Amino acid sequence: MSERTTEEWSRVAVSLPGWRWMPGMRVRNGDVRQWGTLAAVHPDGHVDYWDPEFEELLTGKHPSWLDIDPDDPATAGCLLALLGPKVTVYDYGDYADEPGENGKRFRVVVYVGSKGEPASWPPRDCSSLGRACIAAAEALGRWPGGES
């Protein structure tokens, strides 16, 4: 299986039930090549994000136009929160900048049910923590920590 692009990972993430935008996520608006940071999420669904191209805080009426950066550490933290408290993260790198044996470094396992069974096994090996979080949510079919 070939590695997905950043945009493909983003589309998978935002398409799953339980998804919600969170301040601190690194985002990009469509064709803009530079990444900005999500600053606020309003109750009506609008989002404010810092756009480095215009060097100002913009309000987006259509957050579905935004891509998230699955390789950004702050975004990965938000994705972990969306998975909820019953997760285990496996890091197979020896050092912070080294991948695991197969070039993939992270696995995330979500546990469900009263006995704490893994939602899917085996977990998918991914090159970043954010991608591993998205893969775990995709295997589960939802973001359990994002549901009310």
Describe the residue ranges of each PLM region.
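Short intrinsically disordered terminal tails
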Residues: M1-R4, G113-P118, I134-S148
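Short aromatic/hydrophobic-glycine micro-motifs
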Residues: P17-W19, P85, R142
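Short Cys/His-based metal-binding microdomains
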Residues: D125-A136
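Intrinsically disordered, low-complexity regions enriched in Ser/Pro/Gly/Gln/His and often acidic
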Residues: S2, V12-V14, P43, L58, ...
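Extreme N-terminal leader/activation tails
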Residues: M1-L38
